[in-house]
Structure formats: C-alpha cells, structure tokens
Amino acid sequence: MPSSAQNASTPNTFFTASLAAADPEIADAIKGELGRQQHEIELIASENIVSRAVLEAQGSVMTNKYAEGYPGKRYYGGCEWVDVAETLAIERAKKLFGAQFANVQPNSGSQMNQAVFLALLQPGDTFMGLDLAAGGHLTHGSPVNMSGKWFKAAHYTVRRDDQLIDMDEVAKQAEQVKPKLIIAGGSAYSRPWDFKRFREIADSVGAYFMVDMAHFAGLVAGGVHASPVPHAHVTTTTTHKSLRGPRGGLILTNDEDIAKKINSAIFPGLQGGPLMHVIAAKAVAFKEALQPDFKVYAKNIVENARALAETLRGHGFEIVSGGTDNHLMLVDLRPKGLKGNISERALVRSGLTCNKNGIPFDPEKPFVTSGLRLGTPATTTRGFGVAEFKQVGALIAEVLNAVAQSPDGAAPGVEESVKKRVRELTDRFPIYS
C-alpha cells in the first residue's frame, strides 16, 4: 500500500493531461475534422466557422457551472461570474438586433421554437408556417416533429410558376383557418420576406406573428437584410449559421408580457441548467457581430451567393426562384437528369461539401430529392470573394455535368481533378493557422 505521503506527491493528471494523452481516439477524430474543414469547401448553408475566441469561450471552465434561473435570480450559489457572461450576452443581443428583451438560454433552434409554442399556444391550437417542402423547417409544423404532433399546422406554400410566397394566398388561408400564430422564416427560401404584410395579416385574424430568422440573422445583424424585430411579436434565431457563433438559440421580443412568458417557458418549462460555456461563447459572437467588419462580412455573403448562383445558371443549371437575395440557393437538378443524393455524394468526393434538398413540389423522396442547397457563409468567413465563388461554381458544374453523363452516378477522373483544385483553393485560405 502506498503511503499518504506518496499519494500526495503523485501527479494529478486529471487537471493536466492533454486530450491527446487522455483520449487519443477522440483527439484523432477532432484532428481529422479540422483537416476536413481546412481542405474542403463548405457550402452547407446552415454551417459556419467560428473564431478562435468563440472556441476558447465555449471550451472554458464555465462548462463546470450549474446556473438554473436567470442573472440575479439563480437557484444555486456561486453564479456571480456566469451572471456577468449571461448579462453581457443579453445586452449585446438586444443592441445587435434592436430588441428590448432577449433570452440567450435556448440550447438549440428547435428548443427556442418549442419555447415560443409553450409560451403562446395550447396543445391543439392552429398555427401557420411555410411548408417544409417549399423551404420551411421541421419545427414549423412537420407531422414528424413535435410542432406538428401537438398542434394543428396549416401550411402556406409558394407559387409553382416563380417559387415565391403569394401573400394574398397567405391572407386568404389565415382568414380561413384563424391561426393563433403565424410563422415566417424557413431553411431553404432564398428571397425576401414581407414582414410588414405578415404582421398585418396576423393582426387581421388576431394571431401572434413570429419570425424564425435562424438562417439569415447574420444578414440582419450586418444590415443587408430587413429586420423582422420591429414587426414580429417574437423573433427567434440560432446563434450559429450566418451569425457565426456557437450552436444554440436566441429569442427576441419588444413585448414585456411575452418576454416573461418566454423566460418561464425556457426555465422551468423546457430546460434546467443553461449551458453557461455556450452562453459565454454567444456573448463573444454577439460582440464580434457588433463590429464594423461584420457588416462587410454580411455584404460579402450576399454578393458571393449571387455570384455562385449566376455562375451555375451560366453553366445551364436552374436556380429555384431564379436566384437569391440572401446566403443560400436551391439548385433544381431535374433538367440535368440528376438526383440530389447522387449529386451530393459526387460533390463531397470532390471536396465540395453540400446537402441534398427538396425543391418546391419535389416528386422525389426526402432521402433522394431533386435539388441541392448551397450556401456561402462558411467559405466567406475564410475569405473567399466573388472571384473564388465563380471558380467554385465552375467546379460544381464540372462535377455534376460529368456525373450526368455517367451511368453509375460517379465520375472518378473528374472528381479527383476537381478535388486537387479545391485543395489549391483552400490552401490559400487557411483556418486556425
């Protein structure tokens, strides 16, 4: 048996061992993921690359602290420093979006939307949202999601001829179904939202108006997209995507009564202890988004998206609604005789990361699809500009045109050639170097 003196002198590696020493398998996985992010061109519209400061905050000792409740009103002691972090996050979010109230505790986009439902609706109430097949989101009433199981979802859609939302039809539908809540926002809609008209429609039927700006919040923060905050009763957003922060949620409102309901819905309604390390990282990201260079970043996202869309159109690809006014686009692959799943795999093999996506009135199943969704936030963060995105568009077209001529959905020679050129591009724009 070792003596107590020997125990006291034994190094305590729990506080000193590196990840590589403590868990080499996970360390290798992280190293591999860093390599993937460095050497591939990230075109998934919902992804971005955070700053080293955000990484540092999220990996901090604040992960150790439980803090049920809100700043100054916690159920645990020792919360003085996490109170500082959460208060900074709240105040910065309010300043960034011009809102009077902000809740920074939602752990995810799904939970932030669930909190609004819990705060403003009763099970069985009717609400309206954009159909998932037309560019909406699972949490806006998909039958497989809680929002579609616990509530009555009435979906509006887009016109067949131009793939745009018909606001007159939204008004007619609202008058017919008398929803308690109307949601604007989605995951694959590339054109502006008429927030003023949506609010007028909501008011005409006595409904709340909610905007889920998860995808375009960074563009709102950067001043290149209209803000929904002056029009909506409540606005939700994730803190990653175009906002370029850690993965999480944020709820904004200018109504004090709604703010109180939202706070109660988050805690104790849906969540217990908030993730204080993530909230600290949110605060860092909000500060970054308040800087003048973030406006330049947001402007570049949109310019790059338009350049990518126009390049693809120039190579014979159809873009849903004819183009984009934000950070994303849907590519209709049907004229090329391609499917989304096959196209996604070919592009990933070529170093171009994207996702298959349904298009409006898509005849294919969700795991097949007739489209691709492409976005520019992550690669814009790296420093790619219009010239580089024109190159990216040409590379995408080269791969897909080759795959369209292949009977087995692959073009190894072209894919390998494109992958080398992708590597040359990404080497010019390193991350975390």
From Swiss-Prot:
It is found in: Cytoplasm. One of its GO terms (cellular component) is cytosol. Its main location: cytoplasm. Keywords: Amino-acid biosynthesis, Cytoplasm, One-carbon metabolism, Pyridoxal phosphate, Transferase. It is an enzyme of class 2 (transferase). (6S)-5,6,7,8-tetrahydrofolate binds at residues 132, 136-138. The modification N6-(pyridoxal phosphate)lysine is found at residue 241. GO terms for biological process: glycine biosynthetic process from serine; tetrahydrofolate interconversion. Coiled coil: none annotated. It catalyses: (6R)-5,10-methylene-5,6,7,8-tetrahydrofolate + glycine + H2O = (6S)-5,6,7,8-tetrahydrofolate + L-serine. The record marks 240 as: Plays an important role in substrate specificity. Its cofactor is pyridoxal 5'-phosphate. The keyword Amino-acid biosynthesis applies. Its EC number is 2.1.2.1. Pfam families: SHMT. Pathway: One-carbon metabolism; tetrahydrofolate interconversion; Amino-acid biosynthesis; glycine biosynthesis; glycine from L-serine: step 1/1. GO terms for molecular function: glycine hydroxymethyltransferase activity; pyridoxal phosphate binding. PROSITE patterns: SHMT. It comes from the Bacteria. Catalyzes the reversible interconversion of serine and glycine with tetrahydrofolate (THF) serving as the one-carbon carrier. This reaction serves as the major source of one-carbon groups required for the biosynthesis of purines, thymidylate, methionine, and other important biomolecules. Also exhibits THF-independent aldolase activity toward beta-hydroxyamino acids, producing glycine and aldehydes, via a retro-aldol mechanism. Belongs to the SHMT family. HAMAP family: SHMT. Homodimer. This is Serine hydroxymethyltransferase. It comes from Afipia carboxidovorans (strain ATCC 49405 / DSM 1227 / KCTC 32145 / OM5).
